[in-house]
Amino acid sequence: MNTRTLAISSMLFWMACSNLFRIRISDESITTVDSGTLVEQFAGDIGFGEFVSMDLTSSAELANQGVEPGDISEVFMENLELEAVSPTGGDLSFIDSVDVYVEAPDLPRVLIASQDDFPEGQALVTFTLEDVDLTDYVVSESMTFDTDVSGNRPDQSTDIAARFTVAIGVTGKGACANATGNR
């Protein structure tokens, strides 16, 4: 290999390793909202508590790419949706509004998504996302998504799937580990 080819190859490798690359992680959680008594329906107790708790830094998607917590430069929510998956033909119209927050030890609770439009007959609803960098939450010992929900319990028990996708920007070190296979 001549010097010019080596220089060009080295420059291309350096450029590839200095740029961020993104890893997308998607997950789903299913919860059941039980049908309510008349009193519960009037009280507005919807029974939709903690959303999901997770440790993204230990996810297989990151580990398989050779990425460690120190390699993460930015994390943003790309998609969040709720879907009534049971009963057949069910919808989310019993919900008035949902605010989704992220929490982690020693970090403030921050609003990351919200929705206040749950039309009758529509099983799938996508949330409006806030522009929040979740990096500090993701690299903490644990991260929790929590919800503030208003509405009434449904007429019949409803299974709701909550789906989300986060995009994780990885530093040059993580990109190089991925490119060279060094883990």
Predicted regions and their residues:
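A short beta-strand element within beta-rich, extracytoplasmic domains
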Residues: 73-89
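Bacterial N-terminal signal peptides that target proteins for export
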Residues: 1-7
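Cysteine-clustered segments with highest specificity for TGF-beta superfamily mature ligands
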Residues: 116-167
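Post-signal-peptide N-terminal segment of Sec-exported extracytoplasmic proteins
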Residues: 37-71
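Exposed low-complexity, polar/acidic, P/S/T/G-rich flexible segments that act as propeptides
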Residues: 82, 153-183
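C-terminal motif of bacterial Sec signal peptides marking the signal peptidase cleavage site
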Residues: 15-16
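Surface-exposed loop/edge segments in extracytoplasmic proteins
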Residues: 106-115
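Short coil-to-beta strand junction motifs in C2/discoidin
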Residues: 75, 91-98
